[in-house]
Amino acid sequence: IAADQSRAARQQVTTWLERDSNRACLWAYKCLLDRAAGSIEEHAKSAAEFARLFPNSPVALAELAIAQVLENRFEEATESLARCTEQCEAQGYFYYRTVAAMTTVGEWLAEQGHIPAAIAYLWITSTRYDSQKQTDTHDLLREICSRGDVPLELRVLPATALTKDKVKELNSSVSQHIWRFRFSAAEQAVERYLETDPEEPQAWYCLGNLRLWQINYPGAAEAYLRCAQLDQLGPLGVLALLRATKLKKSGCGDIEDLYLLRYEVPDPQRTKEALLSDRHLSQASLNNQQLEDLRGIHGEVAPEAQFFLFRYPKPDGFQQFLADLELVRPLVPGFVLYYGRQTDGPAQIVVTGVLESDRPWVESRVREWLGGEEPKLVEASVVSAYSRIIKMLRDLHLITSPSPDGQWSEIESRLVESIPKWRLPPLEPLTLEEAARDPQKKQWVRMFLLDIMLREPEPHVTRPVYEVWKKLELDFSSDELVAVVDEMRDPSLAPLLDPARLSDQKLLDMCFILAYHGQRYLLDRFVPEVLDRRDRLNPQVVGMIYQQHAAILLETKWPEWLSVRPEVQDMIAYCEQHGLPHGKLHEMDLLGLLALLNSESASPEVKDQALSFLRELSKHLFSHHLDDAEIGPTVKRYWEGLAEITRELKVSSAAGQDVRRPSEPKIWTPDVESASEPRLAQPEAKKLWVPGMD
């Protein structure tokens, strides 16, 4: 093995076992070598025999758990893990192989799309059995917890939710079972408690969690709904309702299938002319990454032309949209791709991101592009399910570029007026405003508004939604809200917290939780309060928050980077003062200056100033941060490109021209908003996670 001759080692171990099969150390090697060779079937046989001969061996049980989960025998793997844990406790020692088995089960769950269960298994492993971080379990857990495609409320760290004095004994029993992966036994303990106290919402919430971690989604949803029925006033009931609607995959009744529609084009020239003259279409300027993403739709061929399909025609479509905002009609019913001369087959039109309810309208537009002919539908694929309301809110960014602030103020005002008039299927015939006055419906209104703030955490959306929250008098008691967040480590309620009312420790705790879960925009709400208190807060946490805040500034404020830059410089000075890593802050400053230099709209004076700052910054980075593991490679790359940028600026200035802005060097996904480039109306490119889907 040391000489990297695993095949020879495997043959030798097999030979020795044929002579004497009663050797636990040889079976441990055999299982390890079988897995290294990628022989799943042989490993399963070896693990089964190992566990049969040595039923109390933690290593044998760990290998058996790995074999079972690789064969999709999840319940059996969990039982083997539980027995493994119990034997480790009895022997007073935890083997590395047992932690590896626990992590393997967690990885398998994540690969199968069972994210809440994966987080539970990995959290137990990292917290209880790998506190010294001897494996990569911690990194894997954080990676999964920060996945943006999974609803935040379903990727929080595990908690029993049993905090009342009367359920302390139950909490102790449940916790002991959980630490040993005995989720079924914990579930039975809660069910026995509910036989004597069926009206306790915390017990029902705990039951929902336990079923969730066992991949029993219908049972979990049922328990969460019961909790919500019993807690119609507090934040726990809202969290329960939020989870239940996600598990039922119905959302607030506005979830629809999202289609990719492909049509054959009989007359390419006429159709292309119709596309270019249609006032409902706006040509999309795509960067290289976006074009690469589109290649998979038509083999390796990029579309000849791409358009946003707007519901309202130019030039007055924006005002029409505002007038109809309370009707919840997505602004962009689809994204149109035209494939013409560059393909060997017939010309085609592909329309992506089409909600089922918008298909008739989209097909009427296609018919018009084809000169009134009935379109020949080649493909109609359901690519995901999507919320109509969320799609409408995300579409707003397509009409606010390139100068969003002016239009957004008008949009925000109109949203505050319109949202209370919206209707949801679970609340019909009531509007949100009417339902907020009904004690039986109020939690649904809270859940719906909170869901929007979690799904679309950008300030342009959260500000008007939170204003509606206040307008409808939906606030919880501040102490009650903080208590639930504190006890459950759940960041889902963060949009409702008032940062100014949090103690220093609770403020830092919430910031850490949000950063851990990758919630930059929610975290940014707490930044002003952190800045006000930074002299008495933990500098390391402040430095971490600075990095998150600077990333948002770069994403949303790069056109104003010269005015933003002093704030970033202050962050860097703070980090230097406290001896904290700050290379990433320098890198974001570098990217902000480069964005200005590459901008089409920045004036020559602004570019000259940005270039001067860039030279100064580059010299500093090259002198002091070249060996910085965080940004060393980035420094080298941009240092090499600086000379080319300088030459281009000199040439363009001499010719009296502006330098064209190249494609943004960042990865595009449908829920990344950019003030500089509109997003594609393709929510299917990054599907929203639902239970059991990955």
Q: Language model features by range: what are they?
A:
Residues I1, Y29, E63-I66, R97-T104, ...:
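"A position-specific structural signal for the A-helix of alpha-solenoid helical repeats
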Residues A3-D4, A37, E71, Q112, ...:
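Structural motif corresponding to the intra-repeat A-B loop/turn of tetratricopeptide repeats
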Residues A9, H43, A77, A118, ...:
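Single-residue signature of alpha-solenoid repeat helices
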Residues T15-R19, F50-L53, E86-Y96, S131-T135, ...:
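Flexible helix-coil transition and linker loops at the boundaries of alpha-helical arrays
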Residues D34, Q68, L109, H177, ...:
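Residue at a conserved register position within TPR or TPR-like alpha-solenoid repeats
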Residues L53, P58, A82-E89, A110-Q134, ...:
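TPR/TPR-like (Sel1-like) alpha-helical repeat modules
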Residues L241-L331:
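Short Lys/Arg-enriched alpha/beta "domain-start" segment
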